[in-house]
Regions:
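Glycine-rich phosphate/diphosphate-binding loop of Rossmann-like nucleotide-binding domains
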Residues: 1-13, 17
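Glycine-rich phosphate-binding loop
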Residues: 25-60
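Ser/Thr/Gly-rich flexible loops in soluble cytosolic domains mediating phosphotransfer, phosphorylation
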Residues: 61-101
Length: 139
């Protein structure tokens, strides 16, 4: 997933960095914090369950650029398109809409797992802990 987001960003000629946001588990606020820390003013937030948001620093936290909430249905090409769109926003270009799948049975099928992941993620939230830049290596 991260490799595809990186590829989408790099295809647009931009750089990236990873930052862990500790203060909240709300993906909109995570993405907004990422955007505020970003040199371009655009950030991507990803929850452990896969829900992903593209945000811009001058927007209100709950007024994001794009929200991808069908996490179990987001495939690798979609994550690549998310990276590409975030880079296009950063370059002040108009991105193409990211095609999303819709499956009415995905929510009931994955809701319990998603809730458990979110509960676990929320347990690690620490309002007083500052964001931390991460170095991620792929092997």
């Amino acid at each position: 997933m991260l490799k595809e987001i990186i590829a989408g960003i790099e295809e647009e000629g931009l750089n990236y960095r990873f930052v862990k946001i500790y203060r909240t588990s709300d993906v909109c606020f995570v993405a907004h914090d990422a955007a505020e820390l970003s040199g371009s003013g655009v950030g991507i937030g990803i929850q452990s369950k896969g829900t992903t948001v593209i945000h811009q620093k001058d927007l209100f936290p709950l007024s994001n650029l794009e929200l991808f909430s069908q996490a179990p249905l987001i495939d690798l090409p979609t994550f690549r398109a998310i990276g590409k769109n975030a880079a296009k926003y950063a370059k002040n270009e108009s991105p193409a809409p990211v095609p999303v799948k819709n499956d009415q049975m995905a929510r009931p099928k994955y809701q319990a797992i998603a809730a458990l992941l979110h509960i676990k993620e929320t347990e690690y939230a620490d309002r007083n802990k500052k964001p931390q830049e991460l170095k991620i290596e792929f092997k």
